A protein has these predicted regions:
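Short, well-structured N-terminal submotif of metal-dependent ribonuclease cores
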Residues: 1-37, 51-66, 70, 108, ...
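Active-site neighborhoods of divalent-metal-dependent phosphate/nucleic-acid chemistry enzymes
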Residues: 55-61, 65-115
Length: 129
């Protein structure tokens, strides 16, 4: 099993891991499975910062890779296959960032770590929360 983190989960991991359920914290610990984040998460964070909805101590271009390195998170690229697959998903979730995460998790057989109640409705997707 490999995990893929939703953007909010990454932020809680960075700021206050106690906001994460115990079963999630256990999986994100040193004895847990490999943990990944999508490159699309950096874009989502940058947009939130630019719109004033999020403050980070460093520019996203520095903060995101440093956080990933510190927490041993693997950054996954968004390729054409994932981008196209995200457009072919059922219209359960309209957020394009979440659709990219769902498509990534489905294509790579990963567990998506998310509190979003709509995301588990995608057939074949495994989630953790």
């Amino acid at each position: 099993m490999s995990l893929l983190l939703d953007t909010c989960v990454l932020l809680w991991l960075a700021d206050d891991p106690r906001q994460l359920p115990e079963r999630v914290r256990t999986q994100l610990g040193p004895n847990g499975p490999p943990v990944h984040v999508s490159a699309i998460t950096a874009l989502e964070l940058g947009i939130k910062v630019a719109r004033g909805k999020l403050q980070l101590p460093l520019p996203v271009s520095e903060w995101f890779p440093a956080l990933c390195q510190r927490n041993q998170l693997h950054i996954l690229p968004v390729d054409a296959s994932v981008a196209a697959a995200s457009t072919e998903l059922p219209d359960i979730h309209r957020d394009p960032f979440d659709r990219i995460l769902v498509a990534t998790a489905l294509q790579r057989s990963m567990t998506l770590v998310t509190p979003d109640g709509a995301i588990p409705r995608y057939r074949g997707l495994v989630t953790l929360w």
